[in-house]
Every structure is written in C-alpha cells, then in structure tokens.
Amino acid sequence: MPRTQRNDNFIDKSFTVMADLILKVLPTNKKSKEAFAYYRDGMSAQADGEYAEALENYQEALTLEEDPIDRSFILYNIALVHTSNGDHQTALDHYLQALDLNPKMPQALNNIAVIHHFLGQRSEEAGNDDEAERHYDQAAEYWTQAIRLAPNNYIEAQNWLKTTGRSKVDVYF
C-alpha cells in the first residue's frame, strides 16, 4: 500500500493532500513528479521512524531526479537517516555528496560538524587525544563554513568555537 494511503494523523494527511495537489499542477515532466512522490513518501516514512522504507524511497527519488539542487536535498535526507542510525561514515559521505551539488547548504555543514564533534568526544573518552583534536578541528572547520552561510544560526557552535579558541574573529561576516 502506498505510504500516502497509510497516514493516520491530520497533519500527515494535510501534507499529503497538498503535495498531491502541487504535483498535479506543477509544470514539470512525469519523471520529476514521480521523483517528488518518492521523496515525499521518504520524508513521511522517515518521520514515522521507518528508516529502511525511507531509504528505499529516497534511493528511487535519487534515481529519477535530475535537478542537482533537488538531488542535494535527497542526499541530505539520506544522510539524516544514516545519522539517526549511527552510521556516521555513510552519513558523512552523503552530506558531502549533497554539498558537492549544493555548496550553499549550511544545515549539511552543521551536521558534518556535529558528527565530527561527537566522534571527537568519543575519541577523547577512549583516551585518544590526537584523534579527538583532529575531529574537533574538523568540526570547527565545518561549523565555520556553516556560520559564514548563516551567521544568525548555530549560536551554540559559535560559542563552542569561541570557548575552545577555534573561532576566527572575522569568520562570521
């Protein structure tokens, strides 16, 4: 059964109805509409915690979608699923692919930084200080890039950069 027929709550149903209406009126080709339908079903499955189903839908959408910006958001959502599953390397790979297609995606830069920060903490707890510093430096690089793109966001990251001495004074302007 298609995911659009299984949504039980009002917001999901409303989103599905609106998405279906948009699909019908958009002046795009059939392949793009089909890609969007898979993407929409992937987001719905992801919201329900059905990560395997979400990945299947995102992979189908990625196969069909030709627009690089749309592909970047599909890759970003694939990365989110892998992040949720704790598969950090696969998540990093997909975030980087998304950035290759759409370099102005601060949320992907932020998520890469968050993963490196997490890996730095884990390395530090394991007593591997050199590896921890490498991850923290990577986190600082990616947060710096994210903040350059969205200077009013990522306040906690800005504070972390300042308190750890990794902040560059002119970086946010």
Curated annotation (Swiss-Prot):
State the PANTHER family in the record.
CELLULOSE SYNTHASE OPERON PROTEIN C, TPR REPEAT-CONTAINING PROTEIN MJ0263
Instruction: Read off the HAMAP family from this record.
Output: Ycf3
Note the SUPFAM superfamilies from the entry. Answer: TPR-like (SSF48452)
Reported function: Essential for the assembly of the photosystem I (PSI) complex. May act as a chaperone-like factor to guide the assembly of the PSI subunits.
What gene, per UniProt, encodes this protein? ycf3
Q: Name one GO biological process term.
A: photosynthesis
Q: Where are the TPR repeats?
A: 35-68, 72-105, 120-153
Compartments, as annotated in UniProt: Cellular thylakoid membrane
Q: State the organism of origin.
A: Synechococcus elongatus (strain ATCC 33912 / PCC 7942 / FACHB-805) (Anacystis nidulans R2)
Q: Which named protein is this?
A: Photosystem I assembly protein Ycf3
Q: Which UniProt keywords apply?
A: Membrane, Photosynthesis, Repeat, Thylakoid, TPR repeat
Q: Which family does it belong to?
A: Belongs to the Ycf3 family.
Q: Report how it sits in the membrane.
A: Peripheral membrane protein
GO CC annotations on file: plasma membrane-derived thylakoid membrane
